[in-house]
Amino acid sequence: MASFQSFGIPGQLEVIKKALDHVRVGVVITDPALEDNPIVYVNQGFVQMTGYETEEILGKNCRFLQGKHTDPAEVDNIRTALQNKEPVTVQIQNYKKDGTMFWNELNIDPMEIEDKTYFVGIQNDITKQKEYEKLLEDSLTEITALSTPIVPIRNGISALPLVGNLTEERFNSIVCTLTNILSTSKDDYLIIDLSGLAQVNEQTADQIFKLSHLLKLTGTELIITGIKPELAMKMNKLDANFSSLKTYSNVKDAVKVLPIM
């Protein structure tokens, strides 16, 4: 079996090996000239990261780190890069000796030594980073949900107060939320209160009409409240014709007029 010694770096080999054993990432070198592209060098960082001993690693293909949730698409990306002798970077779920999953940011680069190709793989455990990303994603999802509160008023009537700015992203979130809720609640009316909107522009007006069309498809009628004088002036400047919609000064007035289901 080929080994790290075969690279022939006289006088510097031990220094290089000690240096690699002190870095905080896993380092492996594989030899594609041998059957199944086995690992011919592994540093202590890889040993500590995976829990496997050096003798359990040398001579094996790196696929022994794969498991139940390893993404086949990323494995294919690695395989293609190796076949083409190209560098590749992936973030992939791997497994330690004890079965613990960890996120591995894997960088593989081809290395030429005396007309012979090797592959150098650098592994960085980014599990904590992925956990933080998931927490952030969950927090943003919760914030989005809180910014789209569908409030049941009484049987057949719900209200959606809009506060702040109605961005494209938030509008899409509202559409998704309304589609899910109204498909089960079967409300006859949805009151959207605009009094809390910080800004009204052509996009806002267009979004309101899109919501009206969407609600008609679900059998729910849109009611608009909170169009204050200054808001009405802005709407007029934008040529937004709300005459096709039922509008009231506030939610309370709308509820008084709407029939009891």
From Swiss-Prot:
Pfam family, one: STAS
Annotated keywords: Chromophore, Flavoprotein, FMN, Photoreceptor protein, Receptor, Sensory transduction, Transcription, Transcription regulation
Post-translational modification: FMN binds covalently to cysteine after exposure to blue light and this bond is spontaneously broken in the dark.
Domain of life: Bacteria
S-4a-FMN cysteine modified-residue sites: 62
PROSITE patterns per record: PAC, PAS, STAS
Domain PAC, chain residue ranges per copy: 88-138
Organism annotation: Bacillus subtilis (strain 168)
One GO molecular-function entry: photoreceptor activity
Role played: Exhibits the same spectroscopical features and blue-light induced photochemistry as plants phototropins, with the reversible formation of a blue-shifted photoproduct, assigned to an FMN-cysteine thiol adduct. Although it is a positive regulator in the activation of the environmental signaling branch of the general stress transcription factor sigma-B, its precise role is undetermined.
Subunit note: Homodimer.
Annotated protein name in UniProt: Blue-light photoreceptor
